[in-house]
Amino acid sequence: HFSDLRANILNWYPIKKSDSVLEIGAGCGAITGTLCEKAGQVTSVELSKRRAQINYYRNEKKNNLTIMVGNLNDMDLGQQYDYVVVNGVLEYAMSFTEGDTPYETFLGKMGSYLKNTGKLLIAIENKLGMKYFAGAPEDHTDIPFFGINGYPGNHSVRTFSKTELQKIKKKSGFP
C-alpha cells in the first residue's frame, strides 16, 4: 500500500491537466499523488478514516486534491468527472453495496459520476490469471483454486474474468 511502484498502474495513462478525476477506494494514496500530478482536479474517496489520513499526509502538498471519507454509495458528490478510477475496489463491492446485484449497482453509481465523454478505469485481479491455474493462492483468500472454482461459500470478495467484467459493465448501463 505504500510502494511508489503502485503508481505505475496509471502513470502511463494520458490524463491531462484539464481533466478531473474521481478516485474510489484511494486507500493510503499509492496512486493519488500520480493522479494529482497528471490531472487538474482529483477527488479521492476512502471508506477508512485511517487510510484517508495517511493519504492526506502523503499528499498534503497537492493543492488540487480533495479527500472524502465514507461510503460513496451514501454520498452525492454533485459533480461529474472526466475519469472515475476504481483500483482494487470492485472485488469488495458486495461488502459495501446493498442489493442482489452489488457489482452492477456499484458500477452504475460510478457511471453517474462520469461526464458524457468520461472514462471508467478499473483495475482488478484477473480471476483466470495463469498463476491461479498453476496453484497460486487466490490473492484475497489465500486459498488455491478458490476463484477459478467460483468462490464456493464466499460472500465478501470476488474477482472476475474479462468476459464476466464485460457482462457486469453492460448490466450497469455502460455500452
Explain the meaning of each model-derived region.
Residues 76-84:
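A short acidic, Gly/Pro-enriched loop at the edge of an enzyme's catalytic core
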Residues 28-39:
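Conserved SAM-binding loop of SAM-dependent methyltransferases across substrates and taxa
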Residues 48-50:
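Conserved SAM/SAH-binding beta-strand->alpha-helix loop
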Residues 155-173:
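Short alpha-helix
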